[in-house]
Amino acid sequence: VEQPDSSSSDGIFYYDEASQTKKISDDHVSEYQTIPLNKKQYYSLDITYFKSSLDSHLLDLLWNKKDILFNSARQSDK
């Protein structure tokens, strides 16, 4: 006997007493997609980023600071 799952407010799951497991109702099977557990690699996603003028300015300042620190370390090694 199938009874609606009282813990699920959307009615997607029901409790199957025969197997004593939660199952997905037939009304929502088309919305459900299983994850293939035997797959080790998935498709790659394109990654995009946005760099503002402030980002560029801050990166330039950091780069210049690195150069100053590197050059002062080289001078102190002499």
Swiss-Prot record:
Keyword check for Protease: yes
Entry's Gene Ontology molecular function annotations: metal ion binding; metallopeptidase activity
Major location (coarse): cytoplasm
Cellular component per GO, a single term: cytoplasm
Entry EC number(s): 3.4.-.-
Superkingdom per UniProt: Eukaryota
Record keywords, A-Z: Cytoplasm, Developmental protein, Hydrolase, Metal-binding, Metalloprotease, Nucleus, Phytochrome signaling pathway, Protease, Signalosome
Cofactor: a divalent metal cation
GO annotation, biological process: proteolysis; red, far-red light phototransduction
Localization annotation: Cytoplasm; Nucleus
Function according to Swiss-Prot or TrEMBL: Probable protease subunit of the COP9 signalosome complex (CSN), a complex involved in various cellular and developmental processes such as photomorphogenesis and auxin and jasmonate responses. The CSN complex is an essential regulator of the ubiquitin (Ubl) conjugation pathway by mediating the deneddylation of the cullin subunits of the SCF-type E3 ligase complexes, leading to decrease the Ubl ligase activity of SCF. In the complex, it probably acts as the catalytic center that mediates the cleavage of Nedd8 from cullins.
Family: Belongs to the peptidase M67A family. CSN5 subfamily.
Quaternary organization: Component of the CSN complex, probably composed of CSN1, CSN2, CSN3, CSN4, CSN5 (CSN5A or CSN5B), CSN6 (CSN6A or CSN6B), CSN7 and CSN8.
Protein name per UniProt: COP9 signalosome complex subunit 5b
Species assigned in the record: Brassica oleracea
